[in-house]
C-alpha cells in the first residue's frame, strides 16, 4: 500500500513541478520479469522511473547501503521495494536478492554507473548489471533521463527497445571479465543511443 500511495504522490509532484515527459512507452515489455538500466543524474531518478512505468510493474531498485543506515530509513526503503548494495565490494548478497526478485517475476531497477553523474554525461558502467542480466537471461530495458530537475523545466524520460545479452562463454577469469565489460558497454551504448545522450567512449 505504501508503495502505491507514494507512487501516486510522486507522480503528481513530478508532473506539476518538473513536467516529466515520457517517450517510448511502447517499448515497455508486456511481460515481466525484466531489468531497467538507466543513467543516473539526480537522487529523484528512481521516483521518475517508478512513476513512468505502469503501476502494476512494481520496480525494485538496488540502492546504496548508506541509505539503510537507521531503522526508519531502512524500513521505508524496504517498504517501497528497494534493497541495499555495498558499492565498495562485490556484494553477493545483493546479487542473490536481484536473482530472486527476477525469478519471482519482478522488475529490477539498476543504475549501471553506480553513482550520479555530476556532468550529466554517461560514465563507464560497473559489471554488476551485465552479470545479473546475463545470468538471469531476462531482457534489459534501457532508459535515459535528461533535464535539470528545476521548477517548470521539463525532465524527459526515454525508454528504448529491450535487449537480451548473449550468454557468457569463457575459459578463464580474464575472459569472463572481458566479456562482462563488453556487455556493460553494450548496455551503456543502448542508453546512449536514446536522445540526447551520447555513448561513453570505448577503452581498448
Regions found by a protein language model. Name each.
Residues 94-204:
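Non-catalytic C-terminal accessory region of glycerolipid acyltransferases
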Residues 1-7:
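Helix-enriched interaction subdomains in cytosolic or periplasmic regions
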Residues 15-23:
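Short gly/ser/thr-rich secondary-structure transition/capping motifs
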Residues 10, 79-84, 112-115:
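Short, basic, glycine/proline-bearing loop/turn elements
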Residues 25-27:
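A short, basic/flexible loop-to-alpha-helix module at the beginning of a structural domain
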Residues 21, 90-94:
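Glycine-rich, highly charged phosphate/nucleotide-binding loops
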Residues 6, 15, 29-89:
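Catalytic core of membrane glycerolipid acyltransferases/transacylases, capturing the structured
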